[in-house]
Amino acid sequence: MNEILNTKDINAIGEFFIETWGCQMNEEDSEKLSGMLKKEGYIRTEERENADVIIFNTCCVRENAELKVYGNLGILKGLKSKNPNLIIAVTGCMMQQKGMAETIKKKFPFVDIIIGTHNLHNFPNYLNEVKKKDTSVLKIQEKEDSIIENMPIDRKNSMKAFVTIMYGCNNFCTYCIVPYVRGRERSRTPENIEDEIKKLISEGYKEITLLGQNVNSYGKDLEPKVTFAELLERVNTIDGLERVRFMTSHPKDLTDDVIEAIAKCDKLCEQIHLPVQSGSSEILKKMNRHYDREKYLDVVSKIKKLIPNVALSTDIIVGFPGETEKDFEETLSLVKEVEYDSAFTFLYSIRKGTPAAKFEDQVPEDVKHKRFNRLVEVVNEISAKKNKAYEGKIEEVLVEGTSKNDENKLMGRTRTGKLVNFIGDKDSIGKLVNVKIIKANSFSLTGEEI
């Protein structure tokens, strides 16, 4: 495995600010950037105006994320003119797209560092280069390297942590840019994953979320091969670990042994995120999802049979090219049949460089928005019903801190991922406690510690 390059000669130490768009993988990348900079002696600030180094970690899964980057970069021009020594860096998936780095440099020439997803570990070197030579750096590494282990990481949460088990994606869904910007699938060894988790437990962490673009493909590239189910069983035996979650699962690869592992491993939470994207077999075929409606519902049926109290969540794209009213109605009926606890719903947006961008039968924007609103209404109605079923029950909650809405209350999550605001003892923060659910709200639960 490659080791991170180490530098200790950055001249003046100052403050840095990181803004992150996108998924949990991006969040963990930002934690690594923060870890590297803190190791160099920098201090993190939450105020852009105070920073000596500003880093934007970008996303390109949807157009909206890109527009936010453009808007925020425009704002930085004023900060740069006030403080010429300010160093501005842009990284992440958006920069990994073909020609994007050059576009950013042309539109925003005041940006000092532009790098992609594959050379993030060298960020301190690039920063050093800019400071020493008074130059700019534009380095996009097109091919992914082997996995970099032992990177310093500055985690935002003191009791829950992301642990990446694999990088990249081999699925090539027609709407998705991820395989082009994150590279092919590469799995970490189970030993390295276990070592990271054990270190986190020694630091007081209670809950781990195993991350990958498609965790069910884990281990196929390792020698000897290791299945995701085997990894789950190994992680479940680690002493001191209280809870394990994972995301994201691809329905085509969610095998019976994984479902069985979740059912029998006591530390694995009864929560599965299973993106369906559409309820129409015709649209799923156009998306290149490698399953149809029937296969998806079959997987859901197996999950519910083995894990009766499971909480299911999903991703749904509305307005994919060629989606008819009939296709959309099939999505609505699937949502009603599965009864998701929650769903992340998105309007389809064209991603340049993907096959779907060239599809001619694009759905009009007004139609997309009407369908989206109808879907959200159904999803919210089901979510409220699922939450209502918790009233009167006693749930195990990992207490994360005080409630955002009421500092006199505590907040945490159930094993099924439900957010609970409750009256309790502040000494319980960081612990697992039993909470009686008194009231269900649209997107959270209210309770009291018992």
Swiss-Prot record:
Pfam families, A to Z:
Radical_SAM, TRAM, UPF0004
Which SUPFAM superfamilies does the record cross-reference, listed alphabetically? Radical SAM enzymes
Cofactor(s) the record lists = [4Fe-4S] cluster
Domain MTTase N-terminal span(s) in chain numbering: 14-132
Give residues annotated as binding [4Fe-4S] cluster 1: 23, 59, 93
TRAM domain span: 388-450
**Which UniProt keywords are present, listed alphabetically?**
4Fe-4S, Cytoplasm, Iron, Iron-sulfur, Metal-binding, S-adenosyl-L-methionine, Transferase, tRNA processing
Q: Which reaction does it catalyse?
A: N(6)-dimethylallyladenosine(37) in tRNA + (sulfur carrier)-SH + AH2 + 2 S-adenosyl-L-methionine = 2-methylsulfanyl-N(6)-dimethylallyladenosine(37) in tRNA + (sulfur carrier)-H + 5'-deoxyadenosine + L-methionine + A + S-adenosyl-L-homocysteine + 2 H(+)
Q: Which domain of life is it from?
A: Bacteria
Per UniProt, residues of the Radical SAM core domain are: 155-385
The first-level EC class reads transferase
EC number from the UniProt entry = 2.8.4.3
CDD domains in the record: Radical_SAM
Q: How is the cofactor bound?
A: Binds 2 [4Fe-4S] clusters. One cluster is coordinated with 3 cysteines and an exchangeable S-adenosyl-L-methionine.
Task: Kindly list the places in or outside the cell where this protein is found, as annotated in its UniProt entry.
Answer: Cytoplasm
Assembly state and interactors? Monomer.
User: What family does this belong to?
Assistant: Belongs to the methylthiotransferase family. MiaB subfamily.
What job does this protein perform?
A: Catalyzes the methylthiolation of N6-(dimethylallyl)adenosine (i(6)A), leading to the formation of 2-methylthio-N6-(dimethylallyl)adenosine (ms(2)i(6)A) at position 37 in tRNAs that read codons beginning with uridine.
Protein name, entry field = tRNA-2-methylthio-N(6)-dimethylallyladenosine synthase
Q: State the organism named in the record.
A: Clostridium botulinum (strain Okra / Type B1)
